[in-house]
Amino acid sequence: PQCESETNFHYDIPPGYKDDVLVDVNNMSPSLVSDTQKHERGSHEVKIKHFSPYIAVCVTTFSLAFCCFMVHAAITRQPTHLLPFFFIQVFDLIICLIHILGFMSSTSDIRLVIHTKTGPIYIKSTGLTFIILSISCMMLAFKAYCLGMVWDCYKYLMLNRRGNLLDDWYSDQWGHLSTFWSLLRTGRNRGNNSIGNSGSPNEPNTRPRPDTITYDPANDLPKYEDILKIRNAYAPPPYYCSNTNGNVNTTTTDAVTTNTTITSATTANATTTITTNANTNTSTTTSVISPLTTTNKDDTQINNASSNAHSSC
């Protein structure tokens, strides 16, 4: 009786296609149908036994933790806290791509599962492939869009942290990829739809650029390009122009005249001092020579007197 019920159950299943070959379940023997059903039930039970709720709880916990890190990074402007969630998104994108490739390689098995349902749905292989490909492309596009948003947020926080805000900081994003990624970027184009820009979308961005780049010693060392962008980094000293430095020239002339006067006065004083010293030396010499002359005269008189005495004797 059990075999008859199982056989009647399989008799209600409509015929299906597998690998483009007609498989009629009605023409199969009852023993083959029973063995096939037992094998399918056994494989289903093995799949259920291999499922562990602890793994699901761990994956859910880590996902929530990474989401909390992402929210904390966006609020406190910490770009490094976005990296765990970014890596999770990259891993999810790769896993989704592998699943899509697996579905595309087993399209015939999916058609057989659809045909063996209680409510039969007949669909061609081309239509099923198109539906699976469309859904897969939409899923990949959405995941890639979210991944690009997280990466843009990370770059914005890094540039904002360094104090080097640029208008076209995202211009080289996805530049080496195809046009498909450029279409995805239209939704997050901050150049024409930025906050505070009241112009039309076709007008270029008119946000004021920063005049100078300041360097905070508390952060890491600046780049060579940032140093070159600093105003008057290697500028020569200012030149003296005729239209703006006339007073400076006048002051310089007055200073030269004053120096000439001081030099003349110094020269005159030096000349007077030298003359005075010369006169003093002359007087001293005269006074010294006068006693010597007097002494010589006295000696001459003494000598004359002694000679007269000898002659008288």
Curated annotation (Swiss-Prot):
Residues 1-54, 104-129 are extracellular. Keywords: Cell membrane, Membrane, Phosphoprotein, Receptor, Transmembrane, Transmembrane helix. Residues 301-313 have a biased composition (Polar residues). The keyword Nucleotidyltransferase does not apply. The keyword Metal-binding does not apply. It comes from the Eukaryota. The chain crosses the membrane at residues 55-75, 83-103, 130-150. Residues 76-82, 151-313 are cytoplasmic. Phosphorylated on tyrosine residues. Residues 192-218, 279-313 are annotated as: Disordered. GO terms for cellular component: lysosomal membrane; plasma membrane. It is found in: Cell membrane. Residues 279-295 have a biased composition (Low complexity). It is a multi-pass membrane protein. Cell surface receptor that binds to human complement C2a protein. This results in inhibition of the classical and lectin pathways of complement activation, probably due to interference with binding of C2a to C4b and interference with cleavage by C1 or MASP2 such that C3 convertase cannot be formed. This infers resistance to complement-mediated cell lysis, allowing parasite survival and infection. Specifically and strongly recognized by a serum from baboons vaccinated with irradiated parasite. Potential vaccine candidate molecule. Interacts (via N-terminal extracellular domain) with human C2a. This is Tetraspanning orphan receptor.
